Curated annotation (Swiss-Prot):
The gene is Lmnb1. The modification N-acetylalanine is found at A2. It comes from the Eukaryota. Lamins are intermediate filament proteins that assemble into a filamentous meshwork, and which constitute the major components of the nuclear lamina, a fibrous layer on the nucleoplasmic side of the inner nuclear membrane. Lamins provide a framework for the nuclear envelope, bridging the nuclear envelope and chromatin, thereby playing an important role in nuclear assembly, chromatin organization, nuclear membrane and telomere dynamics. This is Lamin-B1. It is found in: Nucleus lamina. The modification Omega-N-methylarginine is found at R14, R413.
Amino acid sequence: MATATPVQQRAGSRASAPATPFSPTRLSRLQEKEELRELNDRLAVYIDKVRSLETENSALQLQVTEREEVRGRELTGLKALYETELADARRALDDTARERAKLQIELGKFKAEHDQLLLNYAKKESDLSGAQIKLREYEAALNSKDAALATALGDKKSLEGDLEDLKDQIAQLEASLSAAKKQLADETLLKVDLENRCQSLTEDLEFRKNMYEEEINETRRKHETRLVEVDSGRQIEYEYKLAQALHEMREQHDAQVRLYKEELEQTYHAKLENARLSSEMNTSTVNSARGGMMESRMRIESLSSQLSNLQKDSRACLERIQELEDMLAKERDNSRRMLSDKEREMAEIRDQMQQQLNDYEQLLDVKLALDMEISAYRKLLEGEEERLKLSPSPSSRVTVSRASSSRSVRTTRGKRKRVDVEESEASSSVSISHSASATGNVCIEEIDVDGKFIRLKNTSEQDQPMGGWEMIRKIGDTSVSYKYTSRYVLKAGQTVTVWAANAGVTASPPTDLIWKNQNSWGTGEDVKVVLKNSQGEEVAQRSTVFKTTIPEEEEEEEEEPIGVPLEEERFHQQGTPRASNKSCAIM
């Protein structure tokens, strides 16, 4: 018996990686299921007819039995071989579909990571441009600081020259001061000497005065003794002359002493005034020099502090620039490494996808060969039915067409059943048509035909607030509505999937939402979903319509000659040979 992939497994894979309704693999398996069931039914009818012929033709029972045994063994071998190859092909197709879905999911994830890396790279580039702008600003500030530093150094050199000049002047003034002090000391010594001389002259004057007085007294005594001898007339004249001579001598002596004293005082006062003026001039010069030195020292100290501050700022700016350059180089290396890693991973994923596509093409070649084998098998059965005058059951074929698909893919799925009762099925064709429209930024991207989810997408470059928006699903006369919360916002370029409660998916806002009050969105032949904004205006709609038609019966193939061996054709597709040289003898 042929193996079948459970429907629940397909639904689970579709929930984990959403696929389009009636994927090519599912449609192909449905078609294979119908074909195999039709072949099994026809084979069962054929076997029943053979048995009835065996009972009716008792005379030919032994011959028919032998030929039926031979034919049964050949059919059993062909059937086992066919079922084995078909099961292998189905497993390979299932594995390929799963791997392809997994690779598509990984590809989407890597694309998202690549987009995020591009965003991070753009952000790093903007940070780099900002850092470069800041670096240029720091360089301009550093240049201005260097200019200010050069100016300060020039001022410092000029001030140092002025300081040296002031030091020379101070040295000269100090030398002048020492000379003035020495001169003052000499003048002081001279003053003391003059005072001593004046004192000695005064004492000498007093001494001489005393001597003169003694001499006068002596002379007076002598004159007094002579006066006795001189007559009285001459005594008065003599005394008068003597007094006048003494008075003149005293006045002359006093005038000489006074003149000498005045000259001495004038000389002393002049020298003292000169020394005082020289000392004051030296003191004022020294004070001004000291004031200039203090000002120069204070200015030098302020310039030194400014210079140290500028040097500190310059060192800090250089360190910051070096740090920013290191960070920038590190970020560039990290970005290049991450981009190279992602590009290598994407290249590996592309290689894996290409390998999977090649394997898928090979499996399609195998499937095409199996379809041709099934067709040859059908021709054999129809030839035997026509030869034995059996009523063939009409072929059952299912074709599904999608409005969004550009090719027709036939896949098989299902488990064959042995049918004991002859039954005929009408050939049918199922077509699915989708139509969608949108007048705003949000469109309805997908409706699950199983009623598990509805997906919306924001096609604009702006975030869309969804507060108060309503999504209405209509199937015939029934309708259900879902309202978004007042704070929900659909990001630019983002999709949101609203799952039913029984979809088996966990909520992951803001991309996956769960409608807990509704177990299913519902299924039917005519499904329509309308999206309305908070003002009740229709901004998007999407509808899915299922149509079933009955095509005309295929023309019967010509009857094959009895007992002639049939050889299957060799099929080639894309350079891959697939040949089968099996022959079957039909009696």
